[in-house]
């Protein structure tokens, strides 16, 4: 069976969708997937994933969530900034979606797959939704988008139509 280029996992808030798609992303990038589909946790790819620096993985989420653990956090300089005058955004901004363009235009490193995790999908504002839609309409080869949402009614119908949907 061929993997869809975009999968949207949806269900009530707090059931673990973000953790699930992070684990799914790791298993897609793992070099020695276990018989149960889980990532091995020991290969070079899993090592990079756990250290939040896998070259074929990107996570997109609002700035307001970046202090929470769950994947590719930007550790280092960003954590040492003094209190900013601007509150972290609760939206996924167009700049974040545009930043994926460079990532998607370079060749992949290990398995040939490139994985983008995006949550919560309803945090996409209108400009970022439209930018993502362009990518979903013409997905780069070997790229898989894993999205999570608490409410399908808050997403553009055109984005919904481009994703395989799984209720959780």
Which functions belong to the PLM regions below?
Residues 96, 116, 120, 124, ...:
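Helical "lid/switch" subdomain of P-loop NTPase nucleotide-binding domains
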Residues 102, 134, 161:
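Conserved adenine-binding aromatic site and its adjacent loop/helix in ATP-hydrolyzing domains
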Residues 105, 130-147:
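Conserved catalytic/switch belt of AAA+ P-loop NTPases
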Residues 120, 147-148, 167-168:
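Small/polar loops that bind or transfer phosphate-bearing groups
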């Amino acid at each position: 069976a061929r993997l869809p280029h975009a999968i949207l996992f949806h269900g009530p808030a707090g059931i673990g969708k973000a953790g699930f798609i992070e684990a799914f992303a790791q298993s897609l990038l793992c070099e020695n997937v276990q018989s149960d589909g889980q990532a091995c946790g020991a290969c070079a790819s899993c090592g990079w994933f756990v250290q939040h620096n896998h070259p074929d993985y990107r996570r997109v989420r609002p700035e307001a969530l970046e202090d929470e653990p769950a994947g590719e956090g930007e550790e280092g300089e960003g954590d040492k900034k003094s209190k900013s005058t601007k509150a972290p955004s609760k939206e996924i901004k167009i700049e974040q979606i545009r930043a994926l363009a460079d990532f998607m235009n370079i060749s992949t490193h290990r398995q040939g797959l490139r994985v983008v995790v995006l949550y919560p999908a309803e945090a996409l504002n209108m400009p970022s939704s439209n930018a993502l839609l362009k990518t979903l309409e013409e997905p780069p080869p070997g790229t898989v988008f894993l999205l999570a949402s608490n409410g399908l009614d808050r997403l553009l119908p055109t984005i919904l139509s481009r994703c395989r949907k799984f209720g959780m």
